[in-house]
Each structure stands twice: as C-alpha cells, then as structure tokens.
Amino acid sequence: MKNITSSSTCSTGLLQLQNNLSCSELEVAEKTEQQAVGPGTIPSPWTPVNAGPPGALGSADTNGSMVDSKNLDVGDMSDDEKDLSSADAEGVWSPDIEQSFQEALSIYPPCGRRKIILSDEGKMYGRNELIARYIKLRTGKTRTRKQVSSHIQVLARRKLREIQAKIKVQFWQPGLQPSTSQDFYDYSIKPFPQPPYPAGKTSTAVSGDETGIPPSQLPWEGRAIATHKFRLLEFTAFMEIQRDEIYHRHLFVQLGGKPSFSDPLLETVDIRQIFDKFPEKSGGLKDLYEKGPQNAFYLVKCWADLNTDLTTGSETGDFYGVTSQYESNENVVLVCSTIVCSFGKQVVEKVESEYSRLENNRYVYRIQRSPMCEYMINFIQKLKNLPERYMMNSVLENFTILQVMRARETQETLLCIAYVFEVAAQNSGTTHHIYRLIKE
C-alpha cells in the first residue's frame, strides 16, 4: 500500500527545477570568466546583498561531491585555510563575495550531476567548484564547494519561505476567491504536502461490490478507473485558441486509453491519508467512502501540462473546457458532480446530468466540451504567471478536485475520483498515475 509522508517542497521542487535546466551557457561563461577584472573593479548588475536573493537561484547542486579532488583548483579546506579571518569564515559572506556568488550563479546554470570541461585547461569541474573558483578569481577570497553548496541551500530555503508566505496572502486574491464560501481560506489548515508516492503493493482485481471476489475476465477491472458495472473511458481538460485563422488545442490533463491484461494491477493508497484534503461535511470523501461501494474510489496524481506560450484569456474568446466519457452495463441517468477544493474546503461545485446511448450492448455517456467556470480559468492563468515550476507546485499542494458519478434515481455512487496535481516538466506533456483507494 502507498504511504504518503510529508516532505519538503523546497527539496523536491527545486531539484526538479534544477534537472530541467541545461548547460548551454557554459561556453559563453568560460569566455566571460577569462575577461574577469580584479577585485574592487567589478560592475554589479545584481541587487545588493541586503535586498535578498534574486528570483531564480536554482537548487542545491550536488555535483561537487562527485568530482575528483585532484582536478580542483578550489577544494576542501586545508589546515592553513581554516585559519582564515573571521570575515572569510564559513557562513559569513561579505558583499563582494555575495556579488561574485550571484554572478557565478548566472554564468554557470545547474547541470545536475554532470561535470564541465573548461577547454583552456582540460579539467573537469562540478558547478559548485566553478562558482568557488569564480569567487576566488574575482575577490581573492576562498570559498569551498561545500560552502557554496550550503549557501545555495540556505538561500533557496529562504526564497521558498518568502514565496509561500506571499502565496498565502497574495495568490488567492479577489477574482479567484469565491464569494459564496466564507471558509475558503483558513490559516489553521496545513498546506497539502505532495510527496511522490513510494512504491507499494498492488491491488487485487475487483469484480464485485466488495473485495475478495475472484477477478473478472474484463481487462480494465483492477487496472483502470472502473468497477464491474461502470468505468471511465476518457477525461480531458483543455483549452482551445484561435489566432489568425489558426486553431490550437492544448491539453492540460488527459486520462484514457485501453487497458489490457498485460498492464499491471493498480497500486493502493489508504484513503485516510487524504481525508483532510477534501471536504469533511456530509457528502464529503469520508462520508461517501463509508456509504460505499468501496471499490468505486480512486486517486489520480496528475502532472498538468501548463507549458504553452500562447497568450490566453476569457476576454479573447478562448475556450477552457472538459470532455469526459463513461460506460455502464446499466441504463441510468448519470449525475456528475465536480468539486474544486482549496485547503480541504469546497470552493465551487458543478453538477451535470447525462443520458445514455446504447452502443455495442453498453450504455455510453458523453459530456462534451463542458465549459470551465470563471474561477478555474482565473486559477490556471494566475498559476501560469508564476515564474518558476516549484512555485506552481507550492500552490497546487493546496488544490484538489473531487469528482463523483451517481445514478440519479438511486443516488448510488458509481465512481468517485480524487485528483491531486503537480506541474509537468518542460516539454514532457501531461502524465498521470492512478491508485485504488482502500481502508485497512
């Protein structure tokens, strides 16, 4: 079973950000370093030290620890170096050192665990060693790669705290904030941690209302969002844009596909770990699960694709919508409820009804191009305007969606899907992972 534990948004968000950056500026950086002037004559395009770190520091770089010390110009401290003056002691960064440090961050972008070869020397360096080397050349003062790594982490944590504080106060501004809910934001509610789910055991296939029944011969049972009587065929959240007679369609989230017997069975997550991420009132996730059927509950972790450079907005006539499709072996009137939640509280709810169409001896339900509400459009646009991916993920820690499909006449829950989100990496497209919710 999956075990969700709290983890540092700083470490996951920043390391993900680091791995997406490239070393394309290294050759230019080398030339810039060779043209460096001596101490005291450095022109500064950076903000002063007391103004705080710049907006994009990158993440703590671990590549320094992987480099052979024989190739270092600036390595670990020797005994003589430990006798440096207090102004140069570890943790003390004078303005000239800080300025050179910030310049080096810009010159040498994060490169993961790769090493960099300087063509004039033929030596291999990690990023932290290059930063330490740059500081030495510019200021004449020594900083080791370990001190550089520690300083990067300190500044990154400080920056993340500042961002999270601003998000609480500034992100949820009028225009996003619903007028119908007074408990939309509660400072006593802890943010929703979004750690990656560690590997857990797989579930057994379910073919009845309770577990323990032998597996069905249908390939989707136990491998997709489905029960023996009802299943999700497709779910797509998208925007459509038309510019100069050119039509664009961008997918934020997409679920679907045809499962086969070769697909692995779904892994499980204890539903109690996410109860506080969704409304607790009557009709909330906990209440629904207790009423059952318990084989109808699923968790979907979505990596939403926000990587589009197209300028959008409701005022330009762009369309934001959702298309979903379901299949049943019973003819019922389907009621689909979609609840958007923030900090575990309901923000808005949309309820739609759909009648079936008989196709290939199955009853099919299609909810086509259902428009997103103004709240969701504003939320996506504000999220896209955040400058860094880890900032977006920090916001999404507190954002969830609960979707409940019921039969109108009996009010039986046919499917209940809990969605949590992160932002997809650059150029990776949208992906997702499905878990079956259980209670042990």
Curated annotation (Swiss-Prot):
Cell compartment(s), UniProt: Nucleus
Pfam families documented for this protein: TEA, YBD
DNA-binding region location: 86-162
GO molecular-function term, one example from the UniProt record: zinc ion binding
Matching InterPro entries: TEA/ATTS_dom (IPR000818), TEA/ATTS_sf (IPR038096), TEC1_TEAD_TF (IPR050937), TEF_metazoa (IPR016361), YBD (IPR041086)
Tissue-level expression: Subset of neuroblasts in the central nervous system and in the peripheral sense organs of the embryo. Expressed in the developing wing primordia initially along the D/V wing boundary, and by the late third larval instar, maximal expression is seen in cells at the D/V wing disk boundary. Less expression in cells located farther from this boundary. Also expressed in wing progenitor cells.
Gene3D superfamilies: 2.70.50.80, TEA/ATTS domain
GO biological process, alphabetically ordered: cardiac muscle cell development; compound eye morphogenesis; embryonic organ development; hippo signaling; imaginal disc-derived leg morphogenesis; imaginal disc-derived wing morphogenesis; negative regulation of DNA-templated transcription; negative regulation of neuroblast proliferation
Region (Disordered): 32-65
GO cellular component, one term: RNA polymerase II transcription regulator complex
Sorted UniProt keywords: Activator, Cell cycle, Developmental protein, Differentiation, DNA-binding, Metal-binding, Nucleus, Transcription, Transcription regulation, Zinc, Zinc-finger
Primary localisation category: nucleus
Its job: Transcription factor which plays a key role in the Hippo/SWH (Sav/Wts/Hpo) signaling pathway, a signaling pathway that plays a pivotal role in organ size control and tumor suppression by restricting proliferation and promoting apoptosis. The core of this pathway is composed of a kinase cascade wherein Hippo (Hpo), in complex with its regulatory protein Salvador (Sav), phosphorylates and activates Warts (Wts) in complex with its regulatory protein Mats, which in turn phosphorylates and inactivates the Yorkie (Yki) oncoprotein.
Oligomeric form and interacting partners: The C-terminus of sd interacts with the C-terminal serine-rich protein domain of vg, to form a complex which acts as a selector for wing development. Interacts (via C-terminus) with yki (via N-terminus) and this interaction enhances its transcriptional activity.
Name of the protein described by the UniProt record: Protein scalloped
Organism for this UniProt entry: Drosophila melanogaster
